[in-house]
């Protein structure tokens, strides 16, 4: 019997892997096996969220409401993000949380669709990617979004997009640690992205959960700032 996962189930997995990544960053010693392993597992989250952002953009009834929801919860989440990361010297004080990054990724898709002039489009897209450098999931999340968006419905292009995403992240992570540790961390990061690709390209049934729709719709938006507050309090 074929294993199937709906959108919400995949998002729950992504939320859990994000939590593991945050626990590793906040509480564990950098460079240790446990820390790097949990961080690598957490690399599953960004491509999944970018994938469903692309899907959400394509099927939402109102892009304005979608963007507004992202922006509102990005603002709500900023203080919890600061308390969990910047206050603990894990990110510069001005770093914006990943919901801001997703908002920028949504803006990127709007530009990709609405701006017809290739030159202007390239400038705006590159500008949005540059702005993301002060956010969590900097640079990479906008590229993920762009690759997934441009892949459209073509299965081969979708697989290629995930392979490129895995390769780029693997190289990036490998460069952060010396020698064998860097290679191992990079390989783990690549596996996480490829696992994300497997979830959405192989096991995703294209459906969302029909039960408690409103609760599940806002679960991630509420969980994100709430878990950051809890982690920040535990770190005190």
Predicted segment positions?
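Alpha-helical transmembrane segments and their immediate juxtamembrane cytosolic regions
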Residues: 1-236
């Amino acid at each position: 019997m074929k294993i199937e996962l709906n959108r919400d189930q995949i998002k729950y997995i992504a939320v859990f892997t994000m939590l593991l990544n945050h626990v590793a960053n906040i509480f564990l010693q950098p460079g240790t096996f446990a820390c790097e392993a949990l961080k690598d597992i957490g690399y599953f989250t960004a491509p999944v969220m970018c994938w469903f952002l692309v899907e959400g953009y394509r099927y939402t009834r109102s892009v304005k409401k979608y963007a507004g929801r992202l922006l509102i919860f990005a603002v709500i989440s900023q203080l919890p993000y600061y308390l969990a990361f910047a206050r603990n010297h894990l990110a510069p004080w001005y770093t914006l949380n990943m919901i801001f990054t997703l908002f920028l990724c949504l803006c990127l898709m709007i530009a990709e669709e609405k701006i017809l002039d290739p030159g202007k489009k390239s400038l705006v897209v590159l500008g949005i990617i540059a702005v993301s450098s002060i956010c969590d999931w900097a640079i990479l999340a906008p590229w993920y979004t762009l690759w997934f968006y441009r892949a459209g419905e073509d299965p081969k292009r979708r697989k290629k997009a995930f392979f490129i995403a895995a390769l780029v992240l693997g190289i990036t992570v490998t460069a952060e640690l010396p020698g064998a540790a860097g290679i191992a961390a990079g390989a783990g990061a690549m596996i996480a992205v490829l696992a994300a690709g497997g979830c959405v390209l192989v096991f995703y049934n294209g459906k969302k959960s029909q039960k408690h729709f409103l609760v599940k719709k806002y679960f991630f938006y509420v969980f994100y700032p709430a878990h950051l507050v809890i982690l920040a309090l535990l770190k005190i």
